[in-house]
């Protein structure tokens, strides 16, 4: 068991352009951290820096309070699971799982014990003599995980391990990963572009954008209190509604085009007259009526999802999505009267994009 610390680490490809801006992260012993963000945000590069596969330009990486910044990957006490299973096709499941231990010179008896225990944990007991071609995608990924488990690492590193699986199998493997972490309690750093994976697997999420950690927090914190416009737009499906407008002179209402004024929860007089962005999750918008002071929205389209529905409409040039109960099925062109609860509104600075 070990903690992991990244202390102001940076990465530059040409010595000038930083692809990882100074980033600090403290992962507690046994904690499961998920790095999530769009392609090119730097999450896989950062993971490879922790693994020792990419050189750290500046800063330090420590595992179990030991500085490993210049240490060879094999000496860091890490095990990595990749998107591609990278199994040897001519070897059995048992041989694939044992191979890394053999080349390290571990004794046969100890190897056999470790492989047997990993196979038991991953329910691969009956598959040990099979070759990779005889396995399903999920079974191959289990073998790849088993190969990492037998090493008994201080830290697990996962680089989008579920990306090659179909949707149904990804759900199953997410559950298995959760159960595996509860059993092993090994410090883990996991990379994905899939926010569902991030929200369901993580104890804490690090949302990355352009080489910067936009926000680090629990899945609930990141969802309920996004620190920036980027986090608000990236986390959530569908994404948070983001509406541009201005805070009125009294700081009590948010004014949109078309004379719509939404009451704000608390005083925002210091932002009076400033261009801001207001956010609200689709599920936090309630149906109301004209008599109750509801705000009108002309509906463009309706997505029927089964458990619920998504109504898409516009206020002028600004789009709005409302999550409705499954029995609510308004037709295109109809007017919905909406209530936007003050305590569910998020306000972001129009210039910096940061939460206020």
Swiss-Prot record:
Task: Describe the location of the ABC transporter domain by residue ranges.
Answer: 4-235
Q: What is its EC number?
A: 7.6.2.10
Q: Identify the domain of life.
A: Bacteria
Q: Which SMART domains match?
A: AAA
Against Pfam families, the record matches this protein to: ABC_tran, OB_MalK
Membrane-protein topology: Peripheral membrane protein
**GO biological process per UniProt:** carbohydrate transport; glycerophosphodiester transmembrane transport
Sorted alphabetically, the keyword list is:
ATP-binding, Cell inner membrane, Cell membrane, Membrane, Nucleotide-binding, Sugar transport, Translocase, Transport
Q: Could you give the subunit structure recorded for this chain?
A: The complex is composed of two ATP-binding proteins (UgpC), two transmembrane proteins (UgpA and UgpE) and a solute-binding protein (UgpB).
What the record says about family reads:
Belongs to the ABC transporter superfamily. sn-glycerol-3-phosphate importer (TC 3.A.1.1.3) family.
Descriptive protein name? sn-glycerol-3-phosphate import ATP-binding protein UgpC
Species name for this entry?
Answer: Escherichia coli O157:H7
């Amino acid at each position: 068991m070990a903690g992991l610390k990244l202390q102001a680490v940076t990465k530059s490809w040409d010595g000038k352009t930083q692809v990882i801006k100074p980033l600090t992260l403290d992962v507690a012993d046994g904690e499961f951290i998920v790095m999530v963000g769009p392609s090119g945000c730097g999450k896989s590069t950062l993971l490879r820096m922790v693994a020792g596969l990419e050189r750290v330009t500046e800063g330090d990486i420590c595992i179990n309070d030991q500085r490993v910044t210049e240490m060879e990957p094999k000496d860091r006490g890490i095990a990595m699971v990749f998107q591609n299973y990278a199994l040897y096709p001519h070897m059995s499941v048992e041989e694939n799982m044992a191979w890394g231990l053999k080349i390290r010179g571990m004794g046969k008896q100890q190897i056999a014990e470790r492989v047997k225990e990993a196979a038991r944990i991953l329910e691969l007991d009956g598959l040990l003599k099979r070759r990779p071609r005889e396995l399903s995608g999920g079974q191959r990924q289990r073998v790849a995980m088993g190969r990492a488990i037998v090493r008994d690492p201080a830290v697990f590193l996962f680089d989008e391990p579920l990306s090659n699986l179909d949707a149904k199998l990804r759900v199953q493997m997410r559950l298995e990963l959760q159960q595996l972490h509860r059993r092993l309690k090994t410090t883990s750093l996991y990379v994905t572009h899939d926010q569902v994976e991030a929200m369901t697997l993580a104890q804490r999420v690090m949302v990355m954008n352009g080489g910067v950690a936009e926000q680090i927090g629990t899945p609930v914190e990141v969802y309920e209190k996004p620190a920036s416009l980027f986090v608000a737009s990236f986390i959530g499906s569908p994404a948070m509604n983001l509406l541009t407008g201005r805070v009125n002179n009294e700081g009590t209402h948010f004014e949109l085009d078309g004379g719509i004024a939404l009451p704000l929860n608390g005083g925002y007089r210091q932002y009076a007259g400033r261009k801001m962005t207001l956010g609200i999750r689709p599920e936090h918008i309630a149906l109301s009526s004209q008599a109750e002071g509801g705000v009108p929205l002309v509906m463009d389209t309706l997505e029927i999802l089964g458990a619920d529905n998504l109504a898409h409409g516009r206020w002028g040039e600004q789009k709005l999505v409302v999550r409705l109960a499954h029995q609510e099925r308004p037709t295109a062109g109809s007017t919905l009267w909406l209530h936007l609860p003050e305590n569910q509104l998020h306000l972001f600075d129009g210039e910096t994009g940061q939460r206020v």
